[in-house]
Amino acid sequence: MIPTTTVTGRLQHRSGLPVQGMVRFTPSRLWVVRDNITWACLAPETRLAADGSFSVQVTPTDTDPIWWRYMIETPAGWWEVSVPHNAAGQTLRGLIGEHHPGSRAAQ
């Protein structure tokens, strides 16, 4: 079985109020191959909690020899990121910071 990685985050406006709406993770690759078995990539979509937080399971982008990424769409903006496997999980802020250093509203 292909491992999954949990991605968590919290989105808030500059005023500190939580962002409301949906978060969508769209993989650039529909399938990955591991040990000669083809697996569908997870493409989760979830509603932000009242405090602007979310948690989803995704297919890590480093489990296949072909390079691919996720597009993460939120009411606060969108990002294209790699999601390496990490049993402890990943944060949206960490994924965004890895590709776009600097201050961001996501946590």
Name what the model sees in each region.
Residues M1-N86:
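Beta-strand-dominated extracellular/periplasmic modules and repeats
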Residues N86-Q107:
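Extracellular beta-sheet/turn segments enriched in Thr/Pro/Gly and aliphatic residues
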